[in-house]
């Protein structure tokens, strides 16, 4: 397995989360009750899995390695801007969810920002897949791919965290509103 393949595998798990985000948003728009603790868990997964783990791997290792060849820099810049957009949408979900938990009716904004996040994820994952393809074919050596993969896998605490986060996705997928 290469670093590119590893990130692609994470994308598969992220798309499981995207399906949950979509179903949650649709259920909220349809007036169905979803426990706020479940929406909290989705919000936590966005913050931890996407931002703290996946985006950090890309921003800390993968993108700098590709950029060191002074190639695909515009694509990297666009993806970094999109990562920031992701953080901003997630912040809106979080802020509206906090207000909802305090008793304000924030169902619609939470549903809207979840829907926005879902649309973002689908588009962003496709762009990253195309980027990985180019980087893999045109730039990165097998040695660089292997070195980054070892870096991704080296911190066992992160591997344990990912396992825990995937269990959270499993749990949410089993909820009535997610089926």
Pin down the residues of each PLM region.
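Small-residue-biased structural context
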Residues: 1-179
């Amino acid at each position: 397995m290469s670093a590119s393949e590893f990130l692609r595998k994470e994308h598969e798990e992220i798309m499981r989360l995207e399906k949950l985000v979509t179903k949650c948003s649709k259920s909220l728009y349809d007036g169905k009750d979803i426990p706020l603790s479940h929406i909290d868990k989705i919000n936590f997964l966005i913050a931890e899995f996407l931002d703290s783990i996946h985006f950090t791997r890309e921003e800390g290792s993968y993108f700098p390695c590709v950029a060191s060849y002074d190639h695909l820099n515009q694509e990297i810049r666009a993806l970094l801007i999109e990562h920031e957009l992701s953080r901003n949408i997630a912040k809106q979900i979080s802020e509206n969810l906090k207000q909802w938990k305090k008793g304000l009716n924030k169902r619609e904004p939470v549903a809207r920002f979840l829907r926005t996040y879902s649309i973002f994820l689908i588009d962003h994952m496709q762009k990253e897949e195309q980027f990985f393809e180019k980087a893999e074919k045109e730039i990165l050596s097998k040695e660089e791919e292997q070195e980054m993969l070892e870096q991704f896998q080296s911190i066992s605490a992160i591997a344990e965290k990912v396992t825990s986060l995937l269990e959270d996705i499993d749990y949410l997928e089993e909820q009535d509103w997610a089926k």
